[in-house]
Swiss-Prot record:
One of its GO terms (biological process) is programmed cell death involved in cell development. Low expression in mature leaves. This is Senescence-specific cysteine protease SAG39. It comes from Oryza sativa subsp. japonica. SMART domains: Inhibitor_I29, Pept_C1. CDD domains: Peptidase_C1A (cd02248). Induction: Accumulates progressively during senescence with maximum levels at late senescence stages. Induced by abscisic acid (ABA), ethylene (ACC) and gibberellin (GA(3)).
């Protein structure tokens, strides 16, 4: 009996010790995560209105870090990272970054497609318009839902470089403030085709430096010094990655994607593969294509969320997938300006 009691006490003692160790470890982990959150806040200049908001955001941050680390522990072609969206739930991210961004077209008027007869077998295996000086540095749209303007401007910057030899950073804010009499509504969303229509009617755009980005809607400023123009625009045949390849081989192309998934929210690098939606809500730019070291074919894309997102602001998504709409719907509504 005495031995049995001694054994019971020993077991209870071990259990209490284990519980204490686990509790201490959890406290230590929480303290380390809190310190990480503080460093993240300092990095991104995040300030909360009170302690309650900070505590709530810390819990969201902690859950997102757990998701990122769990995903990265799996077998994937790409990986995620803790970025500027780490204290946002996915619902908040969708509302802030994608729900007010690209507005899918309800009726697309048929246009010509000048690359229809291009021999796809004669196209280069790899294209990267950055190496040709046709891509300006990564920009950041902030909390304004005007991805459509950044996409249209980036495509225009590309064709202007290819037609004139000059790479000019053009003004997204001019579109945000002045292109408001149709589908495009500044920070509330728009679409690239309508942006191209406005640019044509407006006689072009001025420079970024002459009409700086403000990340907010403002009154249209009268500017008469447009420095670059386009003659028209064309839509790439929908749901056709081969046609999109023909276009991208010749110039940067505006595309729309479903950017609301958590893997898109925290994308850090590699070739994005797997399932994703096709509810188009975000405008970006296809600036090339290629093949990864493991043989996965990809599209190279420029985003407008700053350099801390993705591969220094850029993204690679799997190319030529079985779904004709393309990865995240990128082949559904591509278009490009003409010069």
């Amino acid at each position: 009996m005495a031995m049995a009691k001694a054994l019971l006490f020993a077991i209870l003692g071990c259990l209490c010790l284990c519980s204490a160790v686990l509790a201490a470890r959890e406290l230590s982990d929480d303290a380390a995560m809190a310190a990480r959150h503080e460093r993240w806040m300092a990095q991104y200049g995040r300030v909360y209105r009170d302690d309650a908001e900070k505590a709530r955001r810390f819990e969201v941050f902690k859950a997102n870090v757990a998701f990122i680390e769990s995903f990265n522990a799996g077998n994937h072609n790409f990986w995620l990272g803790v970025n500027q969206f780490a204290d946002l739930t996915n619902d908040e991210f969708r509302w802030m970054k994608t729900n007010k961004g690209f507005i899918p077209s309800t009726t697309r008027v048929p246009t010509g497609f000048r690359y229809e007869n291009v021999n796809i077998d004669a196209l280069p295996a790899t294209v990267d318009w950055r190496t040709k000086g046709a891509v300006t540095p990564i920009k950041d749209q902030g909390q304004c839902g005007c991805c459509w303007a950044f996409s249209a401007v980036a495509a225009m910057e590309g064709i202007v470089k290819l037609s004139t030899g000059k790479l000019i950073s053009l003004s997204e804010q001019e579109l945000v403030d002045c292109d408001v009499h149709g589908e495009d509504q500044g920070c509330e969303g728009g679409l690239m085709d309508d942006a191209f229509k406005f640019i044509i009617k407006n006689g072009g755009l001025t420079t970024e430096s002459n009409y700086p980005y403000a990340a907010a809607d403002d009154k249209c400023k009268s500017v008469s010094n447009s420095v670059a123009s386009i003659k028209g625009y064309e839509d790439v045949p929908a749901n056709n990655e081969a046609a999109l390849m023909k276009a991208v081989a010749n110039q940067p192309v505006s595309v729309a994607v479903d950017g609301g998934d958590m893997t898109f929210q925290f994308y850090k690098g590699g070739v994005m593969t797997g399932s994703c939606g096709t509810d188009l809500d975000h405008g970006i730019v296809a600036i090339g294509y290629g093949k990864a070291s493991d043989g996965t074919k990809y599209w190279l894309l420029k985003n407008s969320w700053g350099t801390t997102w993705g591969e220094n602001g850029f993204l690679r998504m799997e190319k030529d997938i079985s779904d004709k709409r393309g990865m995240c719907g990128l082949a559904m509504e591509p278009s490009y300006p003409t010069a």
